[in-house]
A protein has these predicted regions:
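Hydrophobic faces of well-ordered beta-strands that scaffold small-molecule active sites
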Residues: 26, 90, 132-134
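N-terminal catalytic cores of peptidoglycan-degrading enzymes
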Residues: 1-85
Length: 215
């Protein structure tokens, strides 16, 4: 897990906590192709009126607010959840992208990194998987949107938290391919090397081989 640090400005969170950590809240950034580093830099500036403990993308994670402090990631005037609040939770933001139809999605490597981070926090604070929530579950906000639009994605995420090893990543279309591999895969698609371009079924290792072979 490639962890970086870029602390949020002190005007964007509360120092300390009033309750022990019992929940982990999963968010998405609602941006198109942003990075954990970019978000870390943004929230290091004053008066953003929001924050999260971690930002995750496909190749690294940025710690923005220390876990001992209270990030402003799930506050609201009204709550759907009876107990989860900013002061007893850790907020994790997944960087997002848009497909060719303008719909948000979370890259599979970003999901994998988020799973790894969440598992570590579950173990560290003895948190039940049942207490890993979407922002939506806490306040009703449509976040993370892909995990609300497609409930199966959220169910899969929760299932992966309970597994000892994260399942093998599979890429099924060009939008899911990380930027470093898109050019090589697109060349193969253009040459009609795939019978079904929307069902590529490429593993991470297969993708690396394609790039290394310089297709």
């Amino acid at each position: 897990m490639n962890l970086k640090v870029n602390y949020a400005h002190k005007t964007n969170y509360n120092t300390g906590r009033t309750q022990p950590i019992k929940y982990i809240v999963i968010h998405y950034t609602a941006n198109d192709g942003d990075t954990d580093e970019g978000n870390g830099k943004y929230f290091s500036q004053p008066n953003k009126n929001a924050s999260a403990h971690y930002f995750v993308d496909e190749d690294s994670i940025t710690l923005s607010v220390e876990e001992k402090n209270t990030a402003w990631h799930c506050g609201a005037a009204k709550y759907n959840h009876k107990y989860c609040r900013n002061n007893n939770s850790i907020g994790i933001e997944m960087c997002s992208k848009k497909d060719k139809n303008g719909k948000y999605y979370i890259n599979e490597l970003t999901v994998k990194n988020t799973i790894e981070l969440t598992k570590n926090l579950i173990k560290k604070y003895n948190i039940s998987v049942d207490n890993v929530l979407r922002h939506y579950d806490v306040t009703g906000k449509v976040c993370p949107e892909p995990f609300i639009r497609d409930e199966k994605q959220w169910n899969r995420f929760k299932k992966l938290l309970e597994e000892k090893e994260v399942e093998v990543i599979r890429y099924n279309n060009i939008d899911e391919i990380p930027e470093w591999g898109k050019k090589a895969v697109q060349k193969l698609i253009d040459k009609e090397r795939f019978a079904q371009p929307n069902k590529l079924d490429l593993s991470y290792d297969m993708l690396r081989i394609i790039v290394l072979l310089n297709y």
